[in-house]
Structure formats: structure tokens, C-alpha cells
Amino acid sequence: MHLTDIELLRAEIAAAAARMIAEDGADYASAKRKAARQILGDAKARGEILPDNAQIEDEVRAYNELFFGDTQPARLLHLRQLAVQVMEELARFNPYLTGAVLNGTAGEHSDIHLQLFTSSAKDVEIYLLNKNVNFEVSESNHFKGGQAVVETLSFLLPQKGRAPEGVHLAVYDVDDLRGGVRTASGKRTERADIDAVRRLIVEEDS
């Protein structure tokens, strides 16, 4: 079967975006836009030409295996172990791991992304302040899509003998955790509780 011109362009854009994500720590949306401009120039990128995040994620995995195969697994393990520590600390807020540290594509520039499910975002802020955590407040898109946003608290986690790691806490209402919540694309949200993350770590060590 021959690939169509559109499929070839889509694959080329996905590969370029994956390189930006793996090498520079770009997020998927900006990497996709920059890659499309890089490949298409001034031509308008029609929707069917742009790869979806799943295709880009596959390319990130391939890139990591090819160029960072000797360092990426240890980096991923380190971030997952740190994620467990943070999740233990924030257990009262129902933390779930998401993003690159969960799906296995995390690299040198990746941060830890957690979703918290609680009745009050202010309680999370107060908890962090009482722990002397210096955090910044921003907004992230709700995983259900649309125009909804959620408060996100970001901070640097100090590391003995190495650079601090970035942690981002997207604070959802506790009701968002109930039922079969799906994203705007209809796919079930990818997230893992602390027990699931611990199992991933055991699998990596075995």
C-alpha cells in the first residue's frame, strides 16, 4: 500500500514535532504548529494534514529509543519515583499522574503533571503555603475539552545534588473523578493513581 501525499506530510510533521518535544521540551500543541510551519512553509495547514497527539507520541517514543536509549529509561524511572513521593504528600487531594511521565515518553525536559480532585482548590493552595512551597498559579484546559479551564499550581521540587524538577498540579472538582469521564475526543482520560504508578516502577525495575 502506498502512502498518500497527505499521509507522508502528516508523518513528516509528526516526526519534526517529536524531535522538538524530545530535544527542547516543547508541548504537543506548539510543537505541532512549529513543525507544520517548518514543513509546509506559508501554506495553510489543513486539518487532515496535521497528526494527532497519538501519532506524535509514537514518534517521541521512537526518537527516545533511537537517540536517548541509554539515558531515557533512568530519567523516566527517576521522575516516576519523584511523582510517587509528591502523590504521597498530596494523598488527601486524590492525586493522579498524567502526561509524559505516565505514558513513558518523559525526557530530560519533562515535568511531572498531576491531576488533583478535591472540593476546594484553595485547600491545596493553603496546604502548599503551610509547607513553604513557592508556587505559581495559572490555568490549564480541562480534560473534557471545550472552553473549560482548571486552576493549575506549579512549583520546583528541590533535588539534592541535581537540578530541581518541575511539578504541575491541575486542580479539578471531586465530581470530575466520578463516572467514565472522557476527553473531548471521546477517549478515556489517561491517568494513574499512586498504586498504578508504583506498579509501573516495579515493572521497570524487573
Report residues per predicted region.
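Catalytic core of pol beta-like nucleotidyltransferases
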Residues: 2-25, 29-108, 118-206
